[in-house]
Design a protein with these regions (language model features):
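Residue-level detector of conserved, function-critical positions
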Residues: 115-116
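Boundary at the C-terminal end of the N-terminal hydrophobic targeting segment
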Residues: 18-22
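Bacterial N-terminal signal peptides
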Residues: 7-17
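Conserved histidines in hydrophobic membrane contexts and catalytic metal-binding motifs
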Residues: 61-65, 123-126, 130-132
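Disordered, low-complexity segments in secreted/periplasmic proteins that are enriched in proline
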Residues: 145-153
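Short, non-transmembrane alpha-helical segments in secretory-pathway proteins
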Residues: 26-48, 91-112
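A short, surface-exposed beta-strand/turn
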Residues: 70-84, 132-145
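N-terminal, post-signal-peptide region of Sec/Tat-exported proteins
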Residues: 46-82
Length: 153
């Protein structure tokens, strides 16, 4: 009986959490203009399956899912934050900084970039073999941030 009640409580908490943290569905036309332009330019043949807005840590954020399986996240002003390619494809090459594209081509022959995220000080990229790289815009390894939350000096 205790296990049953504990399981039920866990299910209720999970359900409430999923509802609280889920984004609010919106129409594609409600995205910031920059995000709409990005979709038109880099995903011209793909159809939008779902668009959600969410109040993130840095303000309003938007998530777009495409029918191909690709995904794109945008900041409140419509700049891309993260792009994930559809299975078996790579992210649009035009959004990858040239130095990073050259670095990957030279050091990871045969691999493609399947996901790219903008991070403070650079980019995080995931390659088709599962490798993850954290690089500055000029393809240098990103240094760990100093003095972050929970760290003591």
């Amino acid at each position: 009986m205790k296990k049953f009640l504990a399981t039920m409580l866990l299910m209720v908490v999970a359900s409430v959490s999923a509802t609280i943290f889920a984004g609010t569905p919106i129409k594609q036309s409600e995205l910031p203009k920059a995000a709409q332009s990005f979709i038109t330019k880099y995903f011209p043949k793909d159809q939008v399956r779902k668009v959600e807005k969410d109040n993130g840590r840095r303000g309003m954020e938007y998530e777009v899912d495409f029918t191909s399986g690709a995904e794109a996240d945008f900041t409140s002003d419509g700049n891309w934050k993260k792009v994930k390619a559809a299975h078996g494809t790579s992210v649009p090459s035009a959004i990858v900084p040239t130095a990073i594209a050259k670095y990957v081509a030279t050091n990871f022959k045969g691999q493609t970039i399947v996901e790219i995220s903008r991070k403070r000080g650079g980019y995080e990229v995931e390659l088709s073999n599962g490798s993850e790289l954290k690089l500055t815009e000029d393809a240098k390894p990103m240094q760990p941030r100093q003095g972050g939350r929970g760290q003591r000096r």
